[in-house]
Amino acid sequence: MNIDDLIYVVKNQLDKDFCEHCIEKFKKDDNRYQGGIGRGLDLTTKQSIDLFISDKEDWKEEDTIFFESLSKNFGFYQEWVPDPYERFVHDFPSEDTGYQIQETEPGGFYHWHHDQLGTRHLTFIWYLNDIHHDGYTEFNSGLKIQPEAGKMVIFPGLWPWVHRGVAPKSETKYICTGWIREKIDKDE
């Protein structure tokens, strides 16, 4: 088994009209901001414009659609993950961290990184548009996933799954991303 065996890729998980709707709504939203990383703003590591939508009242309908797609695909991922890794996606109560839309213009990027932070254990990405030249997600194994509207990727957010968002050459790239983390018991 190699690390690519735990990278789940499935097409057509969001309707293309919904993807276009999210892009157009994102472009008009005044709450967009310069994308940061776990330790803050670092333009040598990431250049994107971001918007966390899950706490926005006017994004509730879209948030629900993302949640339904994630719930369905997380269930498929749990069944799909081979031994001995399956216990890591079955044995811990989980929750998503919400949904963040990112816009990466030609020349923008997200350099090599992993998503291990706190209790995160899985990363998910939906591509909201097709990108024809570069703009792919690349893993340190050499696997490259080309953006297609509605395509979803789920993978462990741990350090062996180092990945990057390669700069699109001439098209603006839109994704929606987030993480599944171990559920935090608020009573503790």
Protein language model features and the residues they cover:
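Non-heme Fe(II)/2-oxoglutarate
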Residues: 1-92
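Catalytic core of non-heme Fe(II) oxygenases with the double-stranded beta-helix
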Residues: 67, 72-188
